[in-house]
């Protein structure tokens, strides 16, 4: 959506058969959208992936709330339960996989690195096993000896010869007989204990820093691919949406609402659906997408319920404008860049949020909600532009494209990995790591404070709250402390009058008023070292946070 839609994805042979071209990297990345849902990627039950895909794709790209139809026909819109599961059938053949971004040569090198590391680790583990095994056997024998004789007989019996009941007894006693390393260390001689600690320290070094030096992890990401075996299996309506309870007497064919023809699935189910969705004679996707773009620029969409174009979502405030923008979006080959330019160079976007008081009051009386945008709707910057603005003012923003995400709280991305180097913490806010995990909170406090969702469910529009954590971030966070210092260093290279003028222009995109300039110069004249406090003050002005 940031560039152009590729309209020609297949070649057509003379006999009329369609053959998919080799997938481009951006196509594989795009499919990763379906793997980013709130699903357990290690689970064998993939029903949650398909159901989540239906709900998210229909909401995000079609402006429909179809969740009701998972259990029954939609109560308001013409969407049947059968339509929901026909859409689910589109995604039924998809399975989650981890896609490695590496060339064949890189894969060979990685295999060599892993093999060399494994040999080094095995060499470090061997003396530990030799040292601990006699102690382990003695502790095990001592624990078995205090068990009842009939239990001892079961434990000493070969696992292959045990009956099912005997195996149950052995399993029940396993926690009692398990010998942990700390128990072994307790009974070691002092000499062996010192030797064991040294060996463990060496192994820990190998598993940590040494592994990171020897084995360079290949870049990879989660995506989906088509399982051809699943593609041949039938799909069914699910009782109450439960993947474990398919109604075998209610099979469904792949399809989607609002399409009465016969889909051509020779290229693929998802491909056929996406071709229909983005066809030039189908304005649905274009309306939904361009409304979201308008919402992002103006704080509210032309259709206020940007994810619900059904009966309960109401009607657009300006249908002709929405239709015209959708037609322009299609005519410009679905180029978001061109639509950004069209909107941002328009007269309505360049209006100010304040102006002649009498005229503002008159407009407010006619249009209290400012639906006709007589003036610009005052709105706070989102979290990511706030981050970018802070670093840009400090002269420390890295605008390079691509690369891994970073965590501003400098947590390791996974166990055993290294935190983000300080040099990589000045990237644009779009690269701040966010999301969810089954075992830890990933969304940084900064993003949470400024209303960024964790991504578990579609978020058609972020809330605009005003809370104490937001003010505290700008008052005393380490990020603002560092940015204020760098901003002050940037201004200190200029004479004070120029520094004051430059500070206002950089932070607020306007020159200071005469009163502001006089007050700033009076404050700084007594002590030029106050430039850091001056920079901090500019960060804490409402104008820095709000688009006016």
Say what each PLM segment does.
Residues 32, 85-93, 143, 148-149, ...:
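Acidic helix/loop microenvironments that form the catalytic cleft of cell-wall polysaccharide enzymes
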Residues 13, 29-30, 83, 150, ...:
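Residues that flank catalytic or metal-binding motifs in active/ligand-binding sites
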